[in-house]
Amino acid sequence: KNGYLLIILHFDNTLYINLSMTKIYKFQDDISTEALKDLEKCSSLAIDTEGSGLQIPHRDKLSLIQFSTGNNDAYIIQPNRKNYKAPNIVKILENAKVTKIGHYLRYDVSGLEYFLKCNVKNIFDTKVASKLCRTYSQNHGLKDLVLEFCGKKLDKRLGSSDWNKKLDELTDAQLQYCSNDVIYLHKIRDALHKMLVRENRLELYENSIHFLKTRIKLDQSGFTEDIFQH
């Protein structure tokens, strides 16, 4: 009906879905031990989150967590919003051997660390990289990077969906939206890294990422403004 090939297989608490050729694995509360072992074998992992708002403490919630290994797959996890206990997710986020690739990680890392009580290690932010090397453009959104480096047009209209619905209530289109936020990030990271090297701005980027952790701590402490501004 919608041009989708949809196959659902049950593996314990995991659902495998082939949606528009994207392999989607759905998990409730946490990823399985088997999935953790698979993800730990990766040198890099794309990450993203969906929330019920701007993550104002005691009001908004971390609704979904998405991962991708870069092989046109997506792991979509709905954390337990009562206690946010997800030890396997925490293990992969704190694994310094695995680079976590994301777009505007100032938002995602802040939410993950606040709700999961973890320390996300080894990150690559495609938005920061884009601003440092794509100076020929004023457009640094994910959809802009996907179009330029992957030749795909993303539909971002579902970004304001109710992500707090039950996992099995999310539509095929919503699942694909969540997947699109991670499945292209590896290719984008590779392209931007080459540009940073070419423009001799890799060290500047690395220093910016080093400061990003402090920027996130400032956000979490209520200092959302630019403290360096006059």
Predicted regions and their residues:
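Long, charged alpha-helical interface segments
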Residues: 210-230
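Acidic, Mg2+-coordinating catalytic module of metal-dependent nucleases/exonucleases
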Residues: 154-215
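Conserved RNase H-like, two-metal-ion catalytic cores of nucleic-acid enzymes
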Residues: 20-144
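A polyampholytic, Gly/Pro-enriched intrinsically disordered region
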Residues: 140-154
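Short hydrophobic targeting helices and cationic amphipathic motifs
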Residues: 5, 9-11, 19
